[in-house]
């Protein structure tokens, strides 16, 4: 419709009509104060255009439509949803998305339908308000400023893409340093020797069945005796092989290690046209390959690790440099999980790249990997933290926080772990990481850590200022983290953090002890008169997770309190009684049932983490001494970087 057709008509003094060739005044311009002049038409048009821009601009910030429909319109029952087959997801992982020790994203569906409805409505309001603010800010800019911002952003992205695609001219030669503490003598105590041998036999059972029924595939289905693949890895194969390499090495399963190495050399291929989880591929594949190189010195592992690292660089092609969660390995196009706070990146995912990327720069001689993860630090340090806490969601386009949901479990967990370990791995020179860690821990203690009526210490979740008194299995890693960082704590606080680690270990042991299977649920609650018990059906499963064993390992190494070996052996017996089947080890759908209901997946992290931590608990401390080795979020081993190899200089304020 022509603009003139939208404007009002005014009667002229002569009785004609102005505003179009109507009546006797056709073709004559109106005159006098009643006539609508050209400048007024332009102003009205501009106002109308601004209104349309605000309305349509908001659409792009609404949540994913499928999430909205399922959460708001259909009120789907979480109890009817199957347990996830794999590790998250922060972590999360909607089959493949909702898990994450981001270290893994939060698994399972939200709680009751009414809460889900309220969460979705709050999210819509928040996204709508953000869209209006951003549209108003854009309208206030001059056209020249908008054009300049667009050109600068395009130039930055183009420069990053060009730089990342520049071919590596071969890897520089490096002097392989023989690893410290990778061979240990047998424990002197016969009972401990027997228990350690049992755990090695468990590894053989898991490995041999994977080899027999799923060789070259990602994971094993031990009941149906076939392969299991998760979309987390796209078309990349061999997750269990790469994840198990360092466990095979330290258990001195030399023949199996050589088999795995040959498969990597001949079959591990990253030239695939598929979308992968940057976080999961980094901690499992990059971490596993780096660890295998540092233990064995085999060049193929260094080559493959750097090759994969280069493939992951396009994930950082965002305006802020905060990487995408998902990346197409062929096209280099990234995106985020559609359910993650309006397309935000997840703290536990982009915060769990630092250790591996610093080592990639160390082994390749190319600083680009270190620069990418140090930029993440720069972005985070510019942001205001609500109550000193780090929300789980960060928008990679705006560089601003998404929903103010804070968790030390799924979606947040390994970010905090990597701050502490970045300082330790730098030979205690990365003072910025140390400060960020202890500042975060202080805020966590103030706002999240609580004690139940019976004296159990737990870590709640923070949602916009309100606490949810729930603790996930993923959160149980924090006991070991607090204890590991105790020596570096501010003056007079070392014993406090060691005791805090012990209290978290006790709480997580209680979550195991209060089930029929003596294995812990995915999440447990402290409300409605219950303590350390899962009350929702979608939180009662156990998928061979390692976090409790991880905390037991650190607590044993740092205190030598025999109860940690006792608790670890209880877990071994429970795994043998309830998870072991003829075809390997399977997760359980409900740890409170009298009879097993299997999920039919042998997770790759069971070999990489759970069995490794158990083996170390029943080994002497000279096997992988903590002063020389750091464990990544998948329990892969990374040595302390020597001081003369620092990629980034950090000065204490």
UniProtKB/Swiss-Prot annotation:
Transmembrane segments: 42-62
Keyword presence, Calcium: yes
GO biological process, one term: mannose trimming involved in glycoprotein ERAD pathway
Claim: Nucleotidyltransferase is one of the keywords in the record: no
Pfam families named in the record: Glyco_hydro_47
Biological or metabolic pathway of the protein: Protein modification; protein glycosylation
Record function comment: Involved in the maturation of Asn-linked oligosaccharides. Progressively trim alpha-1,2-linked mannose residues from Man(9)GlcNAc(2) to produce Man(5)GlcNAc(2).
Protein name (database record): Mannosyl-oligosaccharide 1,2-alpha-mannosidase IA
Classification lineage: Eukaryota, Metazoa, Chordata, Craniata, Vertebrata
């Amino acid at each position: 419709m022509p603009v003139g057709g939208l404007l009002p008509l005014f009667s002229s003094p002569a009785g004609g009509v102005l505003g179009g060739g109507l009546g006797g005044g056709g073709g004559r311009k109106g005159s006098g104060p009643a006539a609508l002049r050209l400048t007024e038409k332009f102003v009205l048009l501009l106002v109308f255009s601004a209104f349309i821009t605000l309305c349509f601009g908001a659409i792009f910030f609404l949540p994913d439509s499928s999430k909205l429909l399922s959460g708001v319109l259909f009120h789907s029952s979480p109890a009817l949803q199957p347990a996830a087959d794999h590790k998250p997801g922060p972590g999360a992982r909607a089959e493949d998305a909702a898990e994450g020790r981001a270290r893994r994203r939060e698994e399972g569906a939200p709680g009751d339908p009414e809460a889900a409805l309220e969460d979705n409505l709050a999210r819509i309001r928040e996204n709508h308000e953000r869209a209006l603010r951003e549209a108003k800010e854009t309208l206030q800019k001059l056209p020249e400023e908008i054009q300049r911002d667009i050109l600068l952003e395009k130039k930055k992205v183009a420069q990053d893409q060009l730089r990342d695609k520049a071919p590596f001219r071969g890897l520089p030669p490096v002097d392989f340093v023989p690893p410290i503490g990778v061979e240990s003598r047998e424990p002197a105590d016969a009972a401990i020797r027997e228990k350690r041998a049992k755990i090695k036999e468990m590894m053989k059972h898991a490995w041999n069945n994977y080899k027999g029924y799923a060789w070259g595939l990602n994971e094993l289905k031990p009941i149906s005796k076939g392969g299991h693949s998760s979309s987390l890895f796209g078309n990349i194969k061999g997750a269990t092989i790469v994840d198990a390499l360092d466990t095979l090495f330290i258990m001195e399963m030399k023949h199996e290690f050589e088999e795995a190495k040959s498969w990597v050399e001949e079959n591990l291929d990253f030239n695939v046209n598929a979308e992968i989880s940057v976080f999961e591929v980094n901690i499992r594949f990059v971490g596993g390959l780096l660890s295998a190189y540092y233990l064995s010195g085999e060049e193929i592992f260094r080559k493959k690790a750097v090759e994969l690292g280069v493939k992951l660089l396009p994930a950082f092609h965002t305006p802020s440099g905060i990487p995408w969660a998902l990346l197409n390995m062929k096209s280099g196009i990234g995106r985020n999980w559609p359910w993650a706070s309006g397309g935000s990146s997840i703290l536990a995912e982009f915060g769990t790249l630092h250790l591996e990327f610093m080592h990639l720069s160390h082994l390749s001689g190319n600083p680009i990997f270190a620069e990418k993860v140090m930029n993440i630090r720069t972005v985070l340090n510019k942001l205001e933290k609500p109550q000193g806490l780090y929300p789980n969601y960060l928008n990679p386009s705006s560089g601003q926080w998404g929903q103010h949901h804070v968790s030390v479990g799924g979606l947040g967990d390994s970010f905090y772990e990597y701050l502490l370990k970045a300082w330790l791995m730098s030979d205690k020179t990365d003072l910025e990481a140390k400060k960020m860690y202890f500042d975060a821990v202080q805020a966590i203690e103030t706002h999240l850590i609580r004690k139940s009526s019976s004296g159990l210490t737990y870590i709640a979740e923070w949602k916009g200022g309100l606490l949810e008194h729930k603790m996930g299995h993923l959160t149980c890693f924090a006991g070991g983290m607090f204890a590991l960082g105790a020596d570096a704590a501010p003056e007079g606080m070392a014993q406090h953090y060691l005791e805090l680690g012990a209290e978290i270990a006790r709480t997580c042991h209680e979550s195991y002890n209060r089930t029929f299977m003596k294995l812990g649920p995915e999440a447990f609650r402290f409300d409605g008169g219950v303590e350390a018990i899962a009350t929702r059906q979608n939180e009662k499963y156990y998928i061979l997770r390692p976090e409790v064993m991880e905390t037991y390992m650190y607590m044993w190494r740092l205190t030598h309190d025999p109860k940690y070996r006792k608790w670890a052996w209880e877990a071994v017996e429970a795994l043998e009684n309830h998870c072991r089947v003829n075809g390997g080890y399977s997760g359980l759908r409900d740890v409170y049932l009298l009879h097993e209901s299997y999920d039919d997946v042998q997770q790759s992290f069971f070999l990489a983490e759970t069995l490794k931590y158990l083996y170390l608990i029943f080994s002497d401390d000279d096997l992988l001494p903590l002063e020389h080795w750091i464990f990544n979020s998948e329990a892969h081993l990374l040595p302390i970087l020597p001081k003369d190899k620092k990629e980034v200089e950090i000065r204490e304020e």
